[in-house]
Curated annotation (Swiss-Prot):
Any Pfam family: RabGAP-TBC
Residues with Phosphoserine modification: 191
Transmembrane segments: 410-430, 485-505, 512-532
Localization: Cytoplasm; Membrane
GO molecular function terms listed in the Swiss-Prot or TrEMBL record: GTPase activator activity
The protein's name in its UniProt record: GTPase-activating protein gyp3
Organism this protein belongs to: Schizosaccharomyces pombe (strain 972 / ATCC 24843) (Fission yeast)
Rab-GAP TBC domain boundaries: 300-520
Keyword Manganese: no
Region (Disordered): 361-381, 581-621
GO cellular component labels: cytoplasm; cytosol; plasma membrane
Modified residues (Phosphothreonine): 193
Gene3D superfamilies: putative rabgap domain of human tbc1 domain family member 14 like domains (1.10.8.270), Ypt/Rab-GAP domain of gyp1p, domain 3 (1.10.472.80)
Topology in membrane: Multi-pass membrane protein
Length: 635
């Protein structure tokens, strides 16, 4: 593909060392030591230069066949059972919530010994004063029901009448019925809730669906990869953008569609060799971790299997089995008491993939994408928007210290295309707690840490690029990348926070995700460094800082050829990236240094270039907007 070229100048791993690298460690280099490498790291050359319209890329697929299946937990490498348990937020194992008078927030959340799964929420208010006024004090308690069915009953009493809302849901669906009962009348009739109540009955829609993602079903049929002249790709996104036309996309996709068909057949043989049934249903278990599995992952997971494969290799099935019904229970809690970020969530729902056919209302297909964010309250939501709302509201309820941060909507939306909303919720939890720790917290601490690690990697691996991007808006180099991040991180932080969704073309982003959920966060660092390496010549040729920003912002959007890009990412003589162990060590080192100098940073003007949730929630809700503001000031 145009834009992806090989560079003749390769950095010398042994001799290069940045003179004043604040994160340098004599025993730790981004070019990992031999003893740190796994056997699979030595067998990756076979994915290089093999992506063409032949069967050459399949030549190595017969090696290292595993004749046994490991459980998800045993395939999590060093992930221990204790570490897996740590992903589950302990306060929600079971809780009682009390709301006191004149207090809109829960006054206390007390843990209980009962598990939260297969529980039912019961809201009651038996106390009424003599003036026929509602008391605002009520209790929400979670109790274990005798069956697998989840029943939620909400009752609010008012002297001679009470309003009750009963919701019964099975494993597959939920049906909500609201009735009002008067003790002096035998008939039941539908009614609106008194406006003084803490919530309205018609807003308590606790239905949860368990259907799989729309793409999983769509991509099972025959001729699913067949090229078409439609303006939409197989995932429902627009083919064309400002960097390539529909014709250019179709020219690339023709050979790539045959590659997808061929790889799917190789995957079916791979699953069959491991005793996994793929004929009657999409597999929920996959081959154990090995050099061969890694090669298959890096060559791309078939779209039909993609959601289940992500869920399996990330440990999602373990969490789901240990916490059945937790998602549904938390959603019901969110119905009763909306999380503090609910307004932000509602605002971003209709900005999530407005050009994707699965997220757009049918009446809007002929409108401009800018109109997609405008939504009428009278117009019913499309199913994907309703699912996205439930996932994000439940996530904000489950992790209140994390809450909601813009870019989580794109992560959740991508998950929902390939899996059920319950699995999408757990994948969002795993991503934020395991793969990108503290990345989306209120102060974006994880984003700052990872950007420090990335900048250190650029400084060591790409000194020519570093000399151009290390300048602040005044043209002064940034030396201490822990105390003060270069302004360019306003761009690269968005890469990490979205895991390249909306940054790279759809197919390329999906291929990065295949590797990301199998190998860990090191894949994001490899991807970022590869992008900067590809644009090194353009970056060095720009004299103005604003031009450098524009080049880096536009670089990933043109990387349509997923095969060519992934092959370069994993090419040994093209990259100098850290191993996962190196990343964890450097994250820990940066975190310690940031903690030790936190008080100084608060008193220093240098902290203005550190990322924070407050600085990222502004006009258009995108971190790139802040970059544009800086660029305007500098011109």
């Amino acid at each position: 593909m145009a834009g992806i070229t090989e560079h003749s100048t390769i950095m010398n791993d042994a001799n290069f060392k940045e003179e004043n690298a604040h994160l340098s460690d004599a025993s730790i280099h981004f070019g990992s030591s031999e003893q740190d490498k796994t056997p699979s790291d030595y067998e990756l050359d076979d994915v290089l230069d093999l992506y063409n319209d032949t069967t050459e890329d399949d030549a190595d697929d017969a090696d290292d066949v595993n004749n046994y299946i490991m459980s998800p937990s045993s395939s999590l490498s060093s992930e221990s059972e204790h570490a897996l348990d740590a992903l589950v937020y302990p306060i929600y194992s079971h809780h009682n919530i009390l709301e006191h008078e004149n207090n809109s927030d829960y006054a206390s959340i007390t843990p209980s010994n009962h598990p939260a799964f297969t529980s039912c929420a019961y809201l009651q208010n038996p106390v009424v004063d003599s003036n026929n006024e509602y008391e605002s004090k009520f209790r929400l308690s979670l109790e274990i029901p005798p069956t697998d069915f989840l029943s939620t009953s909400t009752e609010l009493s008012k002297r001679e009448s009470c309003l009750s809302t009963e919701t019964s849901s099975s494993k597959f669906s939920a049906v909500t019925a609201a009735t009002i009962t008067n003790e002096t009348q035998s008939e039941k009739r539908s009614s609106q809730t008194d406006p003084s109540l803490p919530f309205k009955t018609n807003s308590l829609n606790c239905d949860v669906t368990y259907e799989e993602g729309p793409l999983t079903k769509k991509l099972r049929g025959p001729k699913k990869y067949k090229p078409s002249h439609s303006s939409w790709d197989i995932y429902g996104f627009k083919k064309a953008n400002q960097f390539y036309t529909v014709d250019q996309y179709n020219t690339w996709y023709g050979p790539y569609s045959r590659y997808l068909e061929r790889r799917e057949q190789r995957w079916k043989l791979f699953l069959q060799e491991n005793g996994i049934d793929y004929i009657h249903q999409s597999p929920s278990i996959f081959p154990s971790r090995s050099a061969k599995t890694q090669r298959f992952i890096r060559k791309g997971i078939p779209p039909e299997y993609r959601g289940n494969a992500w869920f399996y290799y990330s440990g999602g099935y373990e969490l789901l089995q240990r916490n059945p019904k937790l998602y549904e229970t938390l959603w019901r809690c969110a119905c009763i008491k909306k999380p503090s970020d609910s307004d932000l969530i509602e605002r971003d729902l209709y900005r999530t993939f407005p050009d994707n056919v699965h997220f757009r209302h049918k009446s809007k297909h002929s409108r401009n994408s800018s109109d997609a964010s405008e939504h009428s309250s009278e117009e019913p939501d499309v199913p994907m928007i309703s699912k996205l709302r439930r996932v994000l509201m439940t996530f904000a309820t489950y992790l209140p210290e994390n809450g909601y941060c813009q870019s989580l909507n794109f992560l959740a939306g991508f998950f929902l295309l390939f899996m059920s909303e319950e699995k999408a919720f757990w994948m969002l939890v795993i991503t934020c707690r395991k793969y990108l720790p503290k990345m989306h917290d209120a102060n974006l601490e994880g984003a700052n840490i990872d950007q420090s690690v990335l900048m250190a990697s650029v400084r060591e691996s790409l000194p020519a690029v570093w000399s151009r991007i290390s300048l602040n808006f005044d043209g002064i180099p940034v030396n201490d990348i822990v105390a003060k991040l270069p302004p360019i991180t306003l761009v690269t932080a968005a890469w990490f926070m979205s895991a390249f969704v909306g940054i790279l073309p759809t197919e390329t982003a999906l291929r990065v995700w295949d590797c990301f959920f199998y190998e860990g966060s090191k894949v994001l660092f490899m991807t970022a460094l590869c992008i900067l390496r590809l644009g090194e010549d353009d970056i060095k040729s720009k004299s103005e800082q604003t031009e450098v920003f524009q080049v880096i912002q536009d670089l990933p959007k043109s990387l349509l050829d997923a095969n060519a890009f992934l092959s370069l990412c994993f090419r040994r003589n093209f990259r100098r990236t850290p191993s996962q162990k190196d990343i964890e060590r450097r994250r820990e080192k940066v975190a310690k240094k940031r903690n030790s100098s936190a008080s100084k940073l608060e008193m220093s003007d240098s902290s203005k270039h550190h990322l924070s949730r407050s600085s990222s929630r502004f006009s258009k809700s995108h971190i790139i907007s802040q970059l544009h503001n800086h660029l305007k000031k500098s011109t």
